[in-house]
Every structure is written in C-alpha cells, then in structure tokens.
Amino acid sequence: MKKIIEIKTDKLFTDITEKVSEYSKTWGKSGLVNIYSKHTTFCIWCSENEILHKADVRFFLDKVAPRYKNPEGEHNNIKYLHDLISLRNDVPSNERINGHSHIRSLFFNSSETIPIDKGMLILGEWKKIFGIELDPPDRDREIVCTFIEE
C-alpha cells in the first residue's frame, strides 16, 4: 500500500507520527513502512518531541549552516556557491536562494523505515516521526509512505 501525506510547512519540525500511524492502522498488517520525502530540502527524522531538544537542533543548524542577511535585512546567501545563480546552468526562473538548506540536509535523511506489528507502529516511548523543513516555511511538501508486508 502507498499513501501520500501532503503538508504546507509552517515551521522547522512537523510531527507526522499520527498521520503515519493512522495509515498503518488502516493497513492493519505487519511489516515495514518507509516514509520518504520527495524534496531535497525537506527531510524525514525520528527523534524526541521535546522543546529544548528541538531548540538545540535549531541552534546547531544555525551554527553549522547559517542563513545570511544583508544590511537591509533581506536574506542573501552569497556565502554558498549553490546560490551563485548566474554561474549555474539550467536554473529555473523560480530558483530559491537556499544553499544553507542544502548543507543542513546533510544531517538528516530523506527517509526513515519503521517496523509495524498488526497495524501498530513500533516506536520507542518518546520517538516521533518528523518532517524537517530546511527552507523557509510555507512550502507545499509531499511525503510518500510505502507499506511493505512481512
């Protein structure tokens, strides 16, 4: 079975655990679910949904791959070669200035695989499934959930 989760991101962390669990219960079998992001700057991550832990992750990302601003306060990522649009070939007209987002994606996965027992996700007590938005929010994103029977 394959299901698509469509979301419009409004923050860095979007908890998708309940939606994946709902699909898993509907499926009702044992096996695995692969949760896959179709996007290069939107990742899938399993971790604890604790506010200070998420603040630590945000702080780490801002240190490792900051999003630069010019003196007028506008975002200007000229620190990243990816953002030198004039030097790149085949760049779409709506290309984002998001070199920092691509560097941040190095720390996450594009997918996670979770075991299922009779329709129930097998997650640890505190473990949640997140979509991680590495670009500025307000993006339409698709997550593919593929259920594989035992």
Where are these regions (language model features)?
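Active-site histidine-anchored catalytic micro-motif
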Residues: 1-150
